[in-house]
């Protein structure tokens, strides 16, 4: 349901105090741009959506530029980014035009190559962690597992 509803939204405004988590991933999977403000550096719940967004964006200059436009550094930036993106969006018939439409296309097309949605890599890494944990247990070793 989230994904279907997110498709009709032009921009998802994240809450700075406690960010979207699973909903952020669903919104980004739909291609809808997400604007976030990681207000508190010491609160993981305030930084979550920025991390999810970075994982959904493509590597390279286009993804880096999009991150600068969608991750605000202050409340003033958050408001300015939201207003700027909203005012820049126009519809020609039913077709959206503007930076917000470009960001939607970028996110939608990045789904198949982004780190966030790379399920095969995630499963491979998890299986590797299980193998390492088993080997350490058999040897009587403990400790962390680094992948």
Q: Could you say what each language-model-derived stretch is?
A:
Residues 6, 15-115:
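Catalytic binding pocket for nucleotide-activated donors in carbohydrate/polymer assembly enzymes
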Residues 9:
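An anion/phosphate-binding loop that grips the pyrophosphate of nucleotide cofactors and donors
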